[in-house]
């Protein structure tokens, strides 16, 4: 509310974000004209409207902390694991079908432990899982 009547800028913008359940967001609004003419109610409506149209036009992303993992399995196990993987929050980065099947996956922290346990169980331990770097990636396209 820097330079504005108290409660007429920051709180209305924050209310828009809260109602849309958005976090880790920054909205900057610059007003050039109309403070005295608009009055307190007009300022609240102006700032709220600005935040709303900004949110409407923004691409909303679901950023998740995740781990890049590499999986190597025999062809005999691939059908089973290809059934399991989509049940978790996973992005397939690449797949290579050579002597073995090698998959590079991004797995959310919430899914990683259970997914890896299930992959080991379903493959009877005939799987290699390599944990790589931890990342922060957009999982908006992944259905929960």
Where are the predicted features?
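Portal/gating segments that form or line small-molecule/metal binding sites
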Residues: 1-22
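Stable alpha-helical structural segments in soluble proteins, enriched in small hydrophobic residues
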Residues: 46, 50-58
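Short amphipathic alpha-helix segments
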Residues: 71-90
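Helix N-cap motif at beta-to-alpha junctions
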Residues: 74-78, 108-113
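Short proline/glycine- and acidic-rich turn/helix-capping motifs at secondary-structure junctions
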Residues: 97-110, 131-144
